[in-house]
Amino acid sequence: MQYSIEINKNTEIFNIDKVAKQAAGAVLMRQGKSVVLATVAREEKQVEEDFLPLTVQYIEKAYAAGKIPGGYVKRETKPSDAETLTARIIDRSLRPLFPKGYAYPTQIVVMVLSADPKVDLQVMSLNAASVALYLSDIPMKAPVCGVRIGKIDGNFILNPNNEELQNSTLDLYVAGVKDELLMIEMRALPDQKENEIFIEAPYADVLTQTTSQNMNELSEDEILEALNLAQKAILNGSNAYEEAFSKHKKNSQIELKNEIEYPEILAFIENNFQKQIKEAINQMAKSERASELNKIAKEISNLEIAKEWSEESVLNTLAKVKRKLIRGQILNEGKRADGRSLNEVRPISIETNILPNAHGSCLFTRGQTQALVVATLGGENDAQMIDLLTEKNPISERFMVNYNFPGFSVGEASPIKAPGRRELGHGNLAKRALYPSVDENYPYVIRLVSEILESNGSSSMATVCGGSLALKAAGVPSLKLVAGVAMGLIFEDNKYAVLTDIMGLEDHDGDMDFKVAGSKDGVTALQMDIKLGGIDQETLKQALYQAKEGRIHILNIMEEAAKEIIVNEEVLPKLELFSVDPSKIVDIIGQAGKTIKEIVEKFGVSIDLDREKGEVKIAGSQNEQIKAAKDYIINITSSQKGTKKGSKDKDISGFELGQEFQGIVKKIAPFGAFVELKNGVDGLLHSSKSKHLNLSENQSLKVKISEIKNGKISVDLCE
């Protein structure tokens, strides 16, 4: 059965009861030339643990874009980072709608079978998964709808295609159901204004471009305006899906777990252990571990009255009392577990460049959350190559943020493994926040690594703060400092409280995790996950403005720390950027790359070439090596009279290894001297072989040929 729905600028075609009929729910969705299959499957037996056993997989098939997977294994293997991040978006959007007490292991799989470069696969995949879930026998009140908002020439655009998104200064992804928002991801997109200028250079006149960059932060009011547009579109989409598919939804006969109450245990604990629990809460405010509650549970279990009580029932009841005390204290007294007011940021300490041999480093500590963020600068060859499904060629990622969360950061003895979804998600959020502050024309590739050394909430935002200062510490001319803060929400009995800089305890027992990052001029990135089943605009507005207050407080502290930064110039890589005649690039490369390999090996540098612009970028650890390599390249490409392009332009057929000549020094360069042998043919006497001599032009030297390679002659001094 096929349904065609015109909604939010898109024509979406759904086929139900056509494929994957053994699944609990399945749809084959088409939009443009993109086709995705979304399926939902669940087990019949509930898990005993008190959590939602939901897994989401998003898989891009290479054949969807007419490709064969690269590498030795010609099939899809582990998911790429992009696939993992899309799976997280789908998971975070759908998870809040599962009913309380649902405990069946459930898997949602979205497979991209055909990929149209013009279609937004993230939005399409979420909507397909939402409809498949709604069609299943899992009780859902309404279908979720996802939309993307862009901004071009100051105007907000609903569901921009990929081409429009390239020209957008905003990427806002929102998911919700009816008039409630469930998940938000936003990033500001910097734009470049290009100006062509003509430069008269010593070796080649070139037409080059200069650019100026705008970070394009959004104000809180602009974000709310964009969210209002998204909310209306979500309502339209959610209603359209419900109208089309409600009659096809399977009847739900799923049994939900009833929350087990232990009134006797609850009364006993509230009457006898309130003081100990409050003390435990104070301790837990300093750590993400629950060991304090376990101690109380053990103490209760040893009592005579508790002989008939299971350890699980005692622990569950303790957790409920703890949650009730924490939330009640916040809502009724405006006081938090660690004694802070609702809008108070934890104490901050900052140290920079504490690692003497790293390019830039920052130890950022906020309360009991600590991030060591390290910046490393590299050449173009250090960029991360990413193979995207809808791109013909791999793209180069020149700004990377890696986030690591070892077990010891929360006092756990767990093995350090490859990064999981959480690490990838937190690193991606920090990258989105910091990216607009880095000039896209900065010549170095940048890698930031965040090592979380201690965690009690908001470690991703500590990564943003530490990362911004680590860039400064590495001498990166970032446009503005960027800070981040995590906001929380407690909502109960029509009362709510917004919390600034939440700790782990408040994240666990709260109703929202809302991370906001930006400069003093606006927001560069935000991410919201809600546990309530939706949030209204008024609450969101308060959270945004309270986050601004906290962000500016943090930025003031960071600005003072930035003034004290001493850049360690000695360890920073050196770089020389210059232009040559683009037609001469082939001379620098040489036959099969022999010449450029020779230069790299001889001078210990890395070289990047732009064939179209004639730009040459040389990077290395020593200025002398870079200058010598530059002079060597200029000598190769120079067309001025009196300067030899190299012995390959002369007939060297009569020269042999070991031949001796009384030569004349014709030119001295930092890397050596060019000695004329005979018939205008030069040999290079490398500087390493003539350091003890004070050579001058026209000086007579006795030399012998030590190497003939690629039409060039190298010589040594005769003994």
UniProtKB/Swiss-Prot annotation:
<dbReference type="InterPro" id="IPR003029">
    <property type="entry name" value="S1_domain"/>
</dbReference>
<dbReference type="Pfam" id="PF03726">
    <property type="entry name" value="PNPase"/>
</dbReference>
<dbReference type="GO" id="GO:0003723">
    <property type="term" value="F:RNA binding"/>
</dbReference>
<dbReference type="GO" id="GO:0000175">
    <property type="term" value="F:3'-5'-RNA exonuclease activity"/>
</dbReference>
<dbReference type="InterPro" id="IPR001247">
    <property type="entry name" value="ExoRNase_PH_dom1"/>
</dbReference>
<dbReference type="GO" id="GO:0006396">
    <property type="term" value="P:RNA processing"/>
</dbReference>
<dbReference type="Pfam" id="PF00013">
    <property type="entry name" value="KH_1"/>
</dbReference>
<feature type="domain" description="S1 motif">
    <location>
        <begin position="658"/>
        <end position="719"/>
    </location>
</feature>
<keyword id="KW-0548">Nucleotidyltransferase</keyword>
<protein>
    <recommendedName>
        <fullName>Polyribonucleotide nucleotidyltransferase</fullName>
        <ecNumber>2.7.7.8</ecNumber>
    </recommendedName>
</protein>
<dbReference type="InterPro" id="IPR004087">
    <property type="entry name" value="KH_dom"/>
</dbReference>
<dbReference type="InterPro" id="IPR020568">
    <property type="entry name" value="Ribosomal_Su5_D2-typ_SF"/>
</dbReference>
<dbReference type="InterPro" id="IPR027408">
    <property type="entry name" value="PNPase/RNase_PH_dom_sf"/>
</dbReference>
<dbReference type="InterPro" id="IPR004088">
    <property type="entry name" value="KH_dom_type_1"/>
</dbReference>
<dbReference type="GO" id="GO:0006402">
    <property type="term" value="P:mRNA catabolic process"/>
</dbReference>
<dbReference type="InterPro" id="IPR012162">
    <property type="entry name" value="PNPase"/>
</dbReference>
<keyword id="KW-0963">Cytoplasm</keyword>
<dbReference type="GO" id="GO:0004654">
    <property type="term" value="F:polyribonucleotide nucleotidyltransferase activity"/>
</dbReference>
<dbReference type="Pfam" id="PF00575">
    <property type="entry name" value="S1"/>
</dbReference>
<feature type="binding site">
    <location>
        <position position="507"/>
    </location>
    <ligand>
        <name>Mg(2+)</name>
    </ligand>
</feature>
<dbReference type="InterPro" id="IPR015847">
    <property type="entry name" value="ExoRNase_PH_dom2"/>
</dbReference>
<dbReference type="InterPro" id="IPR036612">
    <property type="entry name" value="KH_dom_type_1_sf"/>
</dbReference>
<dbReference type="GO" id="GO:0000287">
    <property type="term" value="F:magnesium ion binding"/>
</dbReference>
<keyword id="KW-0479">Metal-binding</keyword>
<keyword id="KW-0694">RNA-binding</keyword>
<dbReference type="InterPro" id="IPR012340">
    <property type="entry name" value="NA-bd_OB-fold"/>
</dbReference>
<dbReference type="InterPro" id="IPR036345">
    <property type="entry name" value="ExoRNase_PH_dom2_sf"/>
</dbReference>
<dbReference type="Pfam" id="PF03725">
    <property type="entry name" value="RNase_PH_C"/>
</dbReference>
<dbReference type="InterPro" id="IPR015848">
    <property type="entry name" value="PNPase_PH_RNA-bd_bac/org-type"/>
</dbReference>
<keyword id="KW-0808">Transferase</keyword>
<dbReference type="GO" id="GO:0005829">
    <property type="term" value="C:cytosol"/>
</dbReference>
<dbReference type="Pfam" id="PF01138">
    <property type="entry name" value="RNase_PH"/>
</dbReference>
<feature type="binding site">
    <location>
        <position position="513"/>
    </location>
    <ligand>
        <name>Mg(2+)</name>
    </ligand>
</feature>
<keyword id="KW-0460">Magnesium</keyword>
<feature type="domain" description="KH">
    <location>
        <begin position="573"/>
        <end position="633"/>
    </location>
</feature>
<comment type="function">
    <text>Involved in mRNA degradation. Catalyzes the phosphorolysis of single-stranded polyribonucleotides processively in the 3'- to 5'-direction.</text>
</comment>
<comment type="similarity">
    <text>Belongs to the polyribonucleotide nucleotidyltransferase family.</text>
</comment>
